[in-house]
């Protein structure tokens, strides 16, 4: 299992969340602040099976592709040693 940590601009977060939940990914949304101008960003956390990581990233890329070359999200994929629901 992997944890995808996705940091996106506020105005993109709803679209990304809807896209991922429609594909049956479970998403936790955390408000955060970052960047030089302290602009509003959202951090999304996804617990994803190893074989679905590329699919999840592909969905995000398909919604955020930009012809201007602007980077609209930052993603980290980290291993999860243990996962429990209580």
Can you annotate each of these PLM segments?
Residues 1-86:
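Positively charged, small/polar-rich N-terminal and surface patches that mediate targeting and assembly
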């Amino acid at each position: 299992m992997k944890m995808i940590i996705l940091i996106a601009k506020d105005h993109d977060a709803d679209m990304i969340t809807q896209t991922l939940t429609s594909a049956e990914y479970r998403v936790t949304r955390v408000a955060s602040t970052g960047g030089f101008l302290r602009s509003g960003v959202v951090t999304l956390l996804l617990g994803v099976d190893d074989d679905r990581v590329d699919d999840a990233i592909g969905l995000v890329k398909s919604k955020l592709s930009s012809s201007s070359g602007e980077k609209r999200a930052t993603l980290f994929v980290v291993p999860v040693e243990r996962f429990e629901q209580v």
